[in-house]
Amino acid sequence: MASTSYDYCRVPMEDGDKRCKLLLGIGILVLLIIVILGVPLIIFTIKANSEACRDGLRAVMECRNVTHLLQQELTEAQKGFQDVEAQAATCNHTVMALMASLDAEKAQGQKKVEELEGEITTLNHKLQDASAEVERLRRENQVLSVRIADKKYYPSSQDSSSAAAPQLLIVLLGLSALLQ
């Protein structure tokens, strides 16, 4: 048999004890950290799965749904408001255009009224003149009628006014037709 020689690192005894104590300390520290972190994790897990937590989660989800619905309704309301504002602007523009048109129509109507008033004044003057002329001709006609009647009773051969009577009658009829 061959001889075997084992070479061991010779470690002093005191170093081995220090190592064991160090490993034991690290192990205890790790175990302590696991326990310190594990206990709150277990408590958190229990609380997270509790009925109150689930109710809170449901409430949060409902709030999100309601918030989303309200945001949609707000968006629709804002769009509707913008549409109404656009319609109001159109209506205001139309009203302004109609008011301008109405003012123009009023001015034109006032001008027409003034023209008609002037024409009425002119026609009234013509009517007064024609009435005065008719009155004058009526008096002349009466005078001529009296003369004609006198000539029937007192005939005269040199009377030229009897030929003017039919002409005067035609003038009177023409004037009365104009007045009507």
Swiss-Prot record:
It comes from Homo sapiens. Residues 49-161 are extracellular. One of its GO terms (cellular component) is azurophil granule membrane. Residues 1-20 are cytoplasmic. Keywords: Antiviral defense, B-cell activation, Cell membrane, Coiled coil, Cytoplasm, Disulfide bond, Endosome, Glycoprotein, Golgi apparatus, GPI-anchor, Host-virus interaction, Immunity, Innate immunity, Isopeptide bond, Lipoprotein, Membrane, Signal-anchor, Transmembrane, Transmembrane helix, Ubl conjugation. A lipid is attached at S161 (GPI-anchor amidated serine). The chain crosses the membrane at residues 21-48. Glycans are attached at N65, N92. Parallel homodimer; disulfide-linked. May form homotetramers under reducing conditions. Isoform 1 and isoform 2 form homodimers and also heterodimers with each other. Dimerization is essential for its antiviral activity. Interacts (via cytoplasmic domain) with ARHGAP44. Interacts with MMP14 (via C-terminal cytoplasmic tail). Interacts with LILRA4/ILT7. Interacts with RNF115. This is Bone marrow stromal antigen 2. There is a cross-link at K18 (Glycyl lysine isopeptide (Lys-Gly) (interchain with G-Cter in ubiquitin)). The extracellular coiled coil domain forms an extended 170 A long semi-flexible rod-like structure important for virion retention at the cell surface and prevention of virus spreading. Pfam families: BST2. Changing C63A: Prevents homodimerization and inhibition of SARS-CoV, HCoV-229E, and HIV-1 viral particles production ex vivo. It is found in: Golgi apparatus, trans-Golgi network; Cell membrane; Membrane raft; Cytoplasm. Tetherin shows evidence of positive (adaptive) selection, presumably as a result of evolutionary pressure applied by antagonistic viral proteins that counteract its inhibitiory activity and this has led to the species-specific tetherin sensitivity to viral countermeasures. For example, Tantalus monkey tetherin cannot be abrogated by HIV-1 VPU due to variation in the tetherin transmembrane region. Similarly, SIV Nefs are able to overcome simian tetherins, but not human tetherin, due to a unique 5-amino-acid deletion in the cytoplasmic tail domain of human tetherin. It is a single-pass type II membrane protein; Lipid-anchor; GPI-anchor.
